[in-house]
């Protein structure tokens, strides 16, 4: 039987890795020769989950057409986020929870996209719909994906469906979702050994907001002071990026996974936009952003609206 590769996006997070493993297992149970693979390095958070539930990580690939004709995408659909040669293979299925953009196929396909916080939440339904029991280890990985994407149910992207799925999966996995989740998030928040350049580029995205060119980077931490103790060095490398890219604003967001607040470090000529957006005053280029954890829902739209009004 011809093999089908199942994979998440480049720079994979825990959902991209764990949902690829979980869906490949379901497809195998249903008779398909499916193999999970990954398009990037495994993060510390994801490795913690794999080690905890004693599951081997998928192998790394950059291209897929040299191996297979057919693939399944999880946790993404946009071409630029997928395998380098995605245009050379047939996409059989997409299981996702993001916007649909830059995606078209030459053949009909099974496409399932739901407005939930995590792909694994959808997969939990699909296991039930197909009458397939979820193994303890796989349930643990799916739970890990939901905890990661929802920041232990605190993110505004989290839905009641995500919480309900997590409770079911935690029971199967034999763990307490809260205590295990905090342990996993802490593992992901261990930034020791990272250079300042790595810290500001671990999870950075560039945006055009009105006439302003803005970059927003975000890291999770158990204590924001562990990161901000290096503020002088951070400002130095951020200023270099601002100059190199011609940015109007670089906002470096350090999110405390225990309090679910963030501290924003704003550098650039348009740093005052952060003050207007959040009704705060920057002191030494920083401000506390109470209750802000999601770049997608709580930072990008708010700053965009502010810049458009300037």
Curated annotation (Swiss-Prot):
Entry-linked Gene3D superfamilies: DHHA2 domain, inorganic pyrophosphatase (n-terminal core)
Family assignment from sequence similarity: Belongs to the PPase class C family.
Keyword Hydrolase: yes
The encoding gene: ppaC
Cellular localization per UniProt: Cytoplasm
Binding site for Mn(2+) 2: 15, 75, 97, 149
Catalytic activity of the protein: diphosphate + H2O = 2 phosphate + H(+)
NCBIfam families on file: PRK05427.1
Chief localization: cytoplasm
Enzyme class: hydrolase
Entry binding sites for Mn(2+) 1: 9, 13, 75
Keywords: Cytoplasm, Hydrolase, Manganese, Metal-binding
Obligatory cofactor(s): Mn(2+)
Co-factor binding details: Binds 2 manganese ions per subunit.
Gene Ontology MF terms: inorganic diphosphate phosphatase activity; manganese ion binding
Protein name: Probable manganese-dependent inorganic pyrophosphatase
InterPro entries for this protein: DDH_dom (IPR001667), DHH_sf (IPR038763), DHHA2 (IPR004097), DHHA2_dom_sf (IPR038222), Mn-dep_inorganic_PyrPase (IPR022934)
Record EC number: 3.6.1.1
């Amino acid at each position: 039987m011809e093999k089908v590769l199942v994979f998440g996006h480049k720079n994979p997070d825990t959902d991209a890795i764990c949902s690829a493993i979980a869906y490949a297992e379901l497809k195998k149970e249903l008779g398909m020769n499916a193999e999970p693979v990954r398009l990037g390095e495994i993060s510390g958070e994801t490795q913690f989950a794999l080690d905890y539930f004693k599951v081997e990580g998928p192998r790394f690939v950059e291209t897929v057409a040299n191996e297979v004709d057919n693939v399944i995408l999880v946790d993404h659909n946009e071409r630029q986020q997928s395998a380098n040669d995605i245009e050379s293979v047939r996409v059989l299925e997409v299981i996702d929870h993001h916007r649909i953009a830059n995606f078209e196929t030459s053949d009909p396909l099974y496409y399932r996209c739901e407005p939930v916080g995590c792909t694994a939440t959808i997969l939990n339904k699909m296991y039930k719909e197909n009458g397939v029991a979820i193994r303890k280890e796989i349930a643990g990985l799916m739970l890990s994906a939901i905890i990661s994407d929802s920041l232990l149910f605190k993110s505004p992207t989290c839905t009641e469906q995500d919480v309900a799925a997590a409770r079911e999966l935690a029971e199967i996995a034999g763990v307490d979702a809260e205590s295990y989740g905090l342990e996993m998030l802490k593992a992901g928040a261990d930034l020791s050994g990272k250079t300042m350049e790595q810290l500001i580029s671990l999870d950075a995205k560039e945006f055009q907001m009105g006439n302003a060119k803005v970059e927003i980077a975000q890291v999770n931490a158990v204590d924001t002071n562990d990161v901000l103790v290096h503020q002088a060095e951070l400002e130095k490398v951020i200023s270099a990026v601002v100059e190199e890219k011609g940015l109007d604003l670089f906002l470096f967001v350090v999110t405390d996974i225990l309090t679910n607040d963030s501290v924003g470090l704003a550098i650039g000529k348009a740093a005052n936009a952060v003050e207007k957006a959040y009704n705060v005053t920057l002191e030494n280029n920083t401000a506390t952003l109470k209750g802000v954890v999601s770049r997608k829902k709580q930072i990008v739209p708010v700053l965009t609206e502010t810049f458009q009004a300037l």
